């Protein structure tokens, strides 16, 4: 099992699919990495040589922000918005949708489970 960017890559999958197990690498980035390293698209991870795995590691380390670094940067960006006190920061702080979605109904994923409100007594 190859280990790239701190992630165990599944050995029986194609390299294009296996690279997407790394946080921060999607379809497009995986295809770009394969193209840079000049690996055939249909090659599987267990067919890669150690030199090819090393080349993939070098390309990812040099050109892409992945895993912990990406998560840290995303968290820092959200924290910066909250510290600024801008509208987006306030929405993050309150746990509400940030990008203008309606909240009268829906938005349950972001707001959490519905809180029961006592009904009118007769």
Curated annotation (Swiss-Prot):
One of its GO terms (molecular function) is structural constituent of ribosome. InterPro entries: Rbsml_uS13_C, Ribosomal_uS13, Ribosomal_uS13-like_H2TH, Ribosomal_uS13_bac-type, Ribosomal_uS13_CS. One of its GO terms (biological process) is translation. One of its GO terms (cellular component) is cytosol. Keywords: Ribonucleoprotein, Ribosomal protein, RNA-binding, rRNA-binding, tRNA-binding. SUPFAM superfamilies: S13-like H2TH domain. It comes from the Bacteria. Residues 99-122 are annotated as: Disordered. PANTHER family: 30S RIBOSOMAL PROTEIN S13/40S RIBOSOMAL PROTEIN S18, SMALL RIBOSOMAL SUBUNIT PROTEIN US13M. Located at the top of the head of the 30S subunit, it contacts several helices of the 16S rRNA. In the 70S ribosome it contacts the 23S rRNA (bridge B1a) and protein L5 of the 50S subunit (bridge B1b), connecting the 2 subunits; these bridges are implicated in subunit movement. Contacts the tRNAs in the A and P-sites. Part of the 30S ribosomal subunit. Forms a loose heterodimer with protein S19. Forms two bridges to the 50S subunit in the 70S ribosome. Belongs to the universal ribosomal protein uS13 family. This is Small ribosomal subunit protein uS13. It comes from Rhodopseudomonas palustris (strain BisB5).
